Amino acid sequence: MSEEIIEAVYRYSSFQNVPLMLIASRNQIDWDGGYVNNWKTPSYISFLSLLKKQYQNADILICRDHCGPLFESSKIKDVYKTIDSDIENNFHLIHVDFSYYDVDYQKKLEESKKAIEYIHKCNSHTLIEVGTDRNTGENLKCVDEIREEFSYFNSISPIAFFVLQTGSLVKEINQRGSFNGKYLRSIRSGILDKDLRIKEHNADYLSKEQLRERNGLVNSMNIAPCLGILQTMTTIQRCNIHGVNFEDFLEESYRSKKMGQMA
């Protein structure tokens, strides 16, 4: 995530008349700062407001990704500070994600429910994305478990997107997963709910053929690493073309240790 990538999203949406989502994780943008320009949430929103003036036809949903306890923290109070700031700054969608919370499955459901209810108490118009699975590319839940989980969350609040493992898995700069269309078809036929909208994470580095496989099965996809790789490669190529030494840039990038953070 960078200023250039963010502007590219607005520009593409405006010129192609395509609705898109900007979905920042807590590592990237948060109420107390993040690794993207060290922006706090209000600073990020101010930047987006400027882009909206420049690209008036852009149709962008401002979203929060992985709103739950992160790898290094289990502090629930910090999650709610994020929620408060997001709602105050008019985020359209919040992804409630307690998959990394170090408790049992039932407790994850309960904490997810509390967060969803709190969000809608603060703003009933905020869209909800939710799921309890870590995206590992394997160990897919059975259809009955998925049905029960979706019904549980949908009884609390209408769910805009339900996060499911699809078999996709990003490793370094490659898509190493194997899309399981049969699994998703069985889920759709098993749940029989026209409001089920599936969100796929780790959807980077997919070919046109792989994207076509998802038609009618996946409603929305998240990408991130491939955009960072694209910007880095473009920067290096431009440096080579114009004879600019980029060794210091690469060293600074390596020392930042940011490549392993949740996108």
Regions found by a protein language model. Give the residues of each.
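Alpha/beta catalytic barrel-like cores
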Residues: 1-64, 71, 229, 233-263
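Active-site capping/gating regions of soluble enzymes
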Residues: 107-123, 133-263
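Short loop/turn segments at secondary-structure transitions that flank enzyme active sites
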Residues: 28, 86, 100, 168, ...
